[in-house]
Amino acid sequence: IESFLRSGKVDLVSFMDHTPGQGQYRDLLVFGDTLKGYRDVSDEDVRDIVRQQQESQKLTYAQITALAAVARERGVSIASHDDDSEDKLAFMDGLEATISEFPISLDIARAARARGMHTIAGAPNVMLGHSHSGNLSAREAVQAGAIDVLCSDYYPAALLDAVFTLRDQCGLDIAKAFALVT
C-alpha cells in the first residue's frame, strides 16, 4: 500500500474494517441476517464466520499511523469508513482524515461534520429509503443537513435516481440534490 501511495497514482486512501462487531455491523444479529440473505448459511456457520473475521490479521495502530503519514506527505486524502463512535472519529481526526464515509448514525454524521470532516452517504441508500445493514438512512441524514456528498457505492446509476428521489419524496430543492452528486 505504501508503494502505491508513493507512486503518485493514488488520490484517496480509505481505512476500512468490515469486521463484525463494530462499524457497519456493530450488531452481530444484523450481520448474521445480512449474511443469510446472501448465502445459504446456518447460525453455526455465521458464528464461525464472525470468529474467523474477528481473528483475522488486521493493520496495527502503528501501520495505520504510518500509512496516514505517507498519505499526508504525498497529498493523498484520507477517509474513515463506517464510523460508529466518537472514539473512532477522534482517532481518524488525529490522522487528519477529512472524509467520513458512511457514518452509521445521525449523531456520528453530525459529530464528523463538527470535526470538519466531509460526510458521504450512498445513493443506493437514498433509493432504498434505508441502509441495507440497518444503519443511517441517507434520506434522513440529507434532510438533517448531515451529509455533504452522495456516492454511487455499489450502483452507479443510483446517483441520478437519488437526485430525483430526494426532490420527489423528500422535498429537497433540485439544485441542492444535484449538488450532492456533482
Stretches with model-predicted labels:
Residues 2-4, 86-95, 134-139, 163-164:
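Distinct, well-ordered alpha-helical segments
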